[in-house]
Amino acid sequence: MSDYNMVAVVKVMPTDPEVNLDELEAKLKEVLPEKFGLAKVEREPIAFGLVALKFYVLAKDEEGYDLDQVLEAFRQVENVESAEVETVSRI
């Protein structure tokens, strides 16, 4: 984890409130490209029972670390409505 110098918060919205968030989180962790790290995952209540998953993705500020790779991988997972980068910060 010490090699990483950036953290991006990626907000993932499930397709509906009935989605099993534990299963969805596990699937998303599996598809995270290997070169990226994961600091933590939080759950954010939105409205009407819908809960977003917030992935704190670790990366390096160098060529080859394109967050679009993470977004595309996440968007391909079943029951994912959307995946967007909320913030990017240096660490």
Swiss-Prot record:
Pfam family, one: EF1_GNE
Family: Belongs to the EF-1-beta/EF-1-delta family.
Name listed for the protein in its UniProt record: Elongation factor 1-beta
Disulfide linkage: none
Function field: Promotes the exchange of GDP for GTP in EF-1-alpha/GDP, thus allowing the regeneration of EF-1-alpha/GTP that could then be used to form the ternary complex EF-1-alpha/GTP/AAtRNA.
Species this protein is from: Thermococcus gammatolerans (strain DSM 15229 / JCM 11827 / EJ3)
UniProt cross-references to InterPro entries, sorted A to Z: eEF-1beta-like_sf, EF1B_bsu/dsu_GNE, Transl_elong_EF1B/ribsomal_bS6, Transl_elong_EF1B_B_arc
Keyword terms: Elongation factor, Protein biosynthesis
Upper classification of the organism: Archaea, Methanobacteriati, Methanobacteriota, Thermococci, Thermococcales
Molecular function GO terms recorded: translation elongation factor activity
Ranges that cross the membrane: none
Coiled coil: none
